[in-house]
């Protein structure tokens, strides 16, 4: 019997050795505490060497371990005598944090601390995921005009909408990086992903909406400030709001003068359908992430010469002035204790032992429902959903079923991560190889006889053997008898081939669907880059778009009616296919061969 692990490298090398779920790894990593400051004098060269070490670390692979190391190095640097340190928050800034952003005493302590914290590891990990995504978009950062910045904002918003389809379920919203890796989310999550990528490229953004009361905000558009104008984007529909006459992107100034431009967006998102009144009374609301409010983040972005530049810190006092130049008096949305606001979304997702403020106990934390949403448990073999196999072996077998989905979607350098960071060649190779491996497994399964009966017999034999071990222990029988019974259980666990094949049969189709969707999305992203960077090569652009269209049709034709598909995913695929077909239709006719 061939070893299944040789067919499926996505699984662990040992079938019974199930690792900690990948999404938990960043939360389980302990961050180093700040070293005790040294009292020795430090030369300017030593100071520069310490900062150079931080820069070298951040240039490496962007994952939690990288930023754990960087935080430790930063705290070593800050522990030495040096003038190049983060500024201290001014009294007016402290007042705004306490009275406008309604930070608790513990949150203020986190924001105002002078050294870098365990929570900063998670924040930097999130920021650099979005920074890598922006770099993968191949944007032109050399142009500094408002028009160029508007185009960068439009392209980043479009990318966020492609990567996260709308599954508008009522639930506590995830932090942006987690919603992004998941690939779908409710309206608040989709909005959060767009805000996060706009933030890291240096565009001030928030939402336009009306506060029903002190704890309920009804946003109807996303707003990004470019120069002295505020442009409106629709995260529900995934498109910019059209301006007057359908031209360009509508500005808030235009909508204030002509509320009819916002009618569809107000009616879709606000309980009060009096459009004119809603537009007149709406504000621009900002909700910067908690960690971004710290002066140390503004300092850090000034000493990290990355390309393109990365915006890590929010200057809320400056934001007030800049939006005022655009004619708007902004406000901040972060009601006291509201863990769903963008300000608290990441900080209250991270558990307290890792520097966060997650209020719920294990089993009730947001991470638990997050992991569950990524695995099609309804497709799991009935033997594992019932009580035929129980205890630790059942958990291991369920892990073998679920681990591939978690690893594929969440782990650094797995295909989803590669697509997000713009590593398309690596993603293509990995995705095609995975589809080939699934076909190999499916061909082997097709040649099996009595697979279900064999798996059931194994499960019943294992249950009997495990029960015997428990009975012998309970009756305090001899060590020899217990050892022999335990050996029988171990032998059965090594001979679980039929059960393993049943698991593979159940997992292969939903996993193939996940892979095919990412492959179509990867081809779509590649075609989008080709269309922007090789504008004079119509045939090359056409080939890229047609390749993408072929994969979208492949996905929809094979999985379009599958019951395990997440709500909204098929509609999203259809929309992206329609976009591709529209792009192809705009191209000049293909040159005929002589």
Indicate residue ranges for each PLM-predicted region:
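Bacterial signal peptide processing site
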Residues: 31-34
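Secondary-structure boundary elements
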Residues: 62-186, 216-218, 227, 387-390, ...
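Hydrophobic/aromatic-rich core segments of domains that either
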Residues: 126-144, 152-162, 167-171, 177-178, ...
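Residues that mark the junctions of alpha-helical repeat units in TPR/alpha-solenoid scaffolds
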Residues: 407, 461, 505-507, 512-514, ...
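Alpha-helical junction/boundary sensor with strong preference for TPR arrays
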Residues: 438, 499, 506, 552, ...
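"A position-specific structural signal for the A-helix of alpha-solenoid helical repeats
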Residues: 511, 518, 522-525, 569-579, ...
